[in-house]
Amino acid sequence: MGQFTGKTVLITGASYGLGEGFAEGFAKEGADLVLTARSKDLLEAVAERCRALGSKVTVAPGDVAVEEDVIRVVKTAIAEHGKIDALINNAGVSDMRGVAPEQYDMTTWNWILSIDLNGAFMYIREVGRHMLENHSGNIVNICSIMGSGANEMNVIAYTAAKGALRNLTQQLGCEWADRGVRVNSVSPGFIITEMVRPALEGMGMDKWIASRTPMRRIGELSEIVGPVMFLASDVASYITGHDLMVDGGTNASNGTYQIPPIHHEWNKDTTPKVGTGYPGVSPRPDWYQVMEMGIPGIHYPLPEA
């Protein structure tokens, strides 16, 4: 028997990347799963692998930014499994175009916050209400070291959202502490996932990041799965309102501000320069395809050759 046998875990953003890793990790430890993300096909692929590990899996597609979808997914989870023991609030997006703050458009800002903050809160609220009724439950929010200090990556909306989610974790961790519900977060550093792969490969950041991480390497997926499972487990029963940094020592060394500067020149004028990236490094064209797919109604032209 695994440490999560008999427990149901709801994972948002479960179709790939960190969410996929969390799903398989919990399945290996006996948990039953409710997986949600926008793509049913991608979710089913993850679900099949988890079922092969012996997990009962419910696939519940939905958009984390749509309140009706969040409510429906939570109701489905309770109807199918009878309870939710743990919520892994993982769904998130970022903007790797490198747009300077003074040039940032509100459409992109609102899109990122609608998922990274508003969507996360709606899941906390809906699942939290259920857990409070049962006087039992664990919530683990996936934050980021970007939410704990300044950085030079020009991901201003992502930074704001993750910082707010970290503070929300601390607030609810205290408010619900005597009602049987623990709320914690994990703040990853750079972990190899599909979300950060464009930055690592397209901008040649892997060596830069490693050089500014005390462990001198980038984290692996398995190295974030374990800490998240720890906080969701009974082993962490006296931990709440805590943000666990899993970053190879980056934050402790003040490394969040030592990532190489992208746009020093941008602060000297107000000319929009979307997507110029690092000096001497061309952004990958598929960044713009991903951004165009991710933000409805927005078109990001490829940079001029």
Label each residue range with its predicted role:
Residues 124-125, 170:
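A short, exposed helix-loop element centered on a Lys and neighboring polar residues
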Residues 185, 207-239, 246-248, 273-305:
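C-terminal helical subdomain
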Residues 61-73, 106, 223:
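The beta1-alpha1 cofactor-binding region of Rossmann-like NAD(H)/NADP(H)-dependent oxidoreductases
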Residues 15-17:
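Conserved glycine-rich cofactor-binding loop
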Residues 98-101, 105-113, 209:
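Substrate-binding pocket helix/loop in short-chain dehydrogenase/reductase
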Residues 140-164, 169-178, 191:
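Catalytic loop of short-chain dehydrogenase/reductase
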